[in-house]
Amino acid sequence: LTRSKNEFVPIDPEGKVVKWYSCGPTVYDDAHLGHARNYVTIDVLRRVLAGYFGYNLRFVQNITDVDDKIILRGRQQYLLADFKSKNPTVTDDLINTTIKAFDAYVKKNLPLLSADVNIGTFNEESGKQYANVIQGKSVDGVGPAGDKEAKIKMHLKTAGTAATALLAPSKSTPEDVDIFYAGAEDVLLPYLDSLYGTSIDASDHTVFTRLTQKYEARFNEDMRSLNVLDPDVVTRVTEYGDQIVTFVEKIVDNGFAYSTSDGSVYFDIEGFEKVPGNHYARLEPWNRGDKGLQADGEGALSQQKTSEKRSDADFALWKSSKPGEPAWKSPWGPGRPGWHIECSVMASDVLGEQMDIHSGGIDLCFPHHDK
């Protein structure tokens, strides 16, 4: 909060117990080097506090296993498996569907390309339109590359790989089919979800837990390979549905949140700040009005605007579940937790009203950690 060095004094009157909450992974994919850097750094600090300073640490780490990314990836993997079972060979129908998927992917993610770009012209045109990015520069060629350019490179690779698979001369053997799907699946995944995602029976939570359990296990394996200590306590969002509902009800009762007609509940930033001493966006106040970060924080499935929000900056504490999304019972109707409220509930349940240390990725300071 102070962005400076301060003396560390535990809440414990005897100065021995340190309560620490570490924001854990959202388990929809494998961990990457950014995760490794984060959790190894936290582990070093944890070992120093316990081993050198002799504090008695209570280290809690969560697993986010309900999230827009998880819902999308779980649905997509389910739909792709079903699609592959119905299309075990590369037919004209499969090719045509994949071309449509390619076109949709390029249109959404690579807007500098012309509307008539196709699998045959993709490499040449993308090389021209995104030359600066390919050369390691910013899109406009003025400044250095950043996160935006990294995502563009990912999209270029995905589309290029799919184009190569579609242009491959032979697709007849089982090995050819495997190679085709390996190259095309990243454009097929979002396309199939756009067609059939809302038709999935989301009451069957195994569509999603099959994904999260797999990647939680892989994350733990990676951390142990890096010699990162296991948490003392692990919490999972799926195990906290009732507590989250109760927590949100208290916020509504306190006058800091409101429900909308679709069954969602939003935090009322203006109402919160009307109370003397309450301030919002303490970690990165300069990002308070960043609509891009706000949208990222709300998730890919929550981009539809509602006129009932009192402010565009108000964020979801509880989201009404749409077709194809998992749901839990609540006073506002079937829904699921908003991303930002989850850690508040789990941390307070295990550690109480106050904690000594809260750690997590710097990229999520605003809006996630500020909630």
How would you name each of these model-derived features?
Residues 1-371:
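NTP-dependent nucleotidyl-transfer catalytic core
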